[in-house]
A protein has these predicted regions:
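General helical secondary-structure elements
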Residues: 2-5, 30-32, 47, 71
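Intrinsic disorder/low-complexity segments
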Residues: 20-22, 37, 73
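Compositionally biased, intrinsically disordered low-complexity segments
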Residues: 15-20, 35, 81, 85
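Negatively charged, low-complexity tracts enriched in Asp/Glu with abundant Ser/Thr
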Residues: 1-27
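Low-complexity, intrinsically disordered short peptide segments enriched in small/polar/basic residues
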Residues: 12-14, 44, 71, 75
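A short, structured beta-strand/loop element
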Residues: 27-64
Length: 85
C-alpha cells in the first residue's frame, strides 16, 4: 500500500506510507503500518499496530491501535521482547 490518506482529525492529516496485514481467527486481522501525521507545524512518522475485523460486506473496521515512535532503540526493544516472551 503506497501513500494512502486514511483520515483527518482536526488539523492533523494522517497518511499511511506502507502497511502489511495478517489475518487470524474467523474475521480478524492485525495491521502493522508506517504512518505520517502532518500538521501546520510539521510532520512526524510513527509505527502503528492495529487490530481490526471484517464486516459481512468485507469492509474493514479497526478496534484498537498502538503507536510506536520511529526510534531505532524503541523498535529494537519491542521486537526483542516480542520474540523472547
Amino acid at each position: 500500500m503506497d501513500e494512502e490518506t486514511r483520515g483527518k482529525r482536526g488539523d492533523v492529516e494522517f497518511v499511511t506510507i506502507r502497511a502489511e496485514k495478517i489475518n487470524f481467527g474467523r474475521n480478524n486481522f492485525l495491521e502493522v503500518a508506517r504512518k505520517r501525521a502532518t500538521t501546520a507545524e510539521g510532520s512526524n512518522e510513527f509505527i502503528s499496530v492495529s487490530r481490526g475485523y471484517y464486516l459481512p460486506d468485507k469492509s474493514e473496521r479497526f478496534k484498537r491501535s498502538l503507536t510506536i515512535p520511529d526510534d531505532p532503540g524503541i523498535k529494537s526493544f519491542i521486537a526483542e521482547k516480542i520474540k523472547s516472551l
